Amino acid sequence: MAASAIKGLSALRSSTGRPIAFVRKIPWTAAASELREHFAQFGHVRRCTVPFDKETGFHRGMGWVQFSSQEELQNALQQEHHIIDGVKIHVQAQRAKALHGAQTSDEERFLR
């Protein structure tokens, strides 16, 4: 994985007080820039990370979006449907558990 992706994920993990959305079911045709553009309608996007699989070269279909405020995150969560490239993506608030050391298996792979 690129060093910038590891650095971005590490920054998201260390910012426990920040409002972060976990996004899954991202279509393979979408890039981080499209994710950032979509979520900018809800507020200022501080960081957007979509990790890539180094073997396939494709992203893993999930990512994280960090907003400037909790209110902006709530605005995004209140939207009933999020569509990128014609595909409905799933958005939820990042669980504190994943940010405080108990890593998911995907996070463990990204941080190696």
Curated annotation (Swiss-Prot):
It is found in: Mitochondrion; Nucleus. InterPro entries: Nucleotide-bd_a/b_plait_sf, RBD_domain_sf, RRM_dom, SLIRP/GR-RBP-like, SLIRP_RRM. Pfam families: RRM_1 (PF00076). One of its GO terms (molecular function) is RNA binding. One of its GO terms (cellular component) is cytoplasm. GO terms for biological process: flagellated sperm motility; mitochondrion organization; negative regulation of mitochondrial RNA catabolic process; single fertilization; spermatid development. The modification Phosphothreonine is found at residue 104. Keywords: Mitochondrion, Nucleus, Phosphoprotein, Repressor, RNA-binding, Transcription, Transcription regulation, Transit peptide. Its main location: mitochondrion. Coiled coil: none annotated. The modification Phosphoserine is found at residues 15, 105. Residues 19-98 form the RRM domain. The keyword Cell cycle does not apply. RNA-binding protein that acts as a nuclear receptor corepressor. Probably acts by binding the SRA RNA, and repressing the SRA-mediated nuclear receptor coactivation. Binds the STR7 loop of SRA RNA. Also able to repress glucocorticoid (GR), androgen (AR), thyroid (TR) and VDR-mediated transactivation. This is SRA stem-loop-interacting RNA-binding protein, mitochondrial.
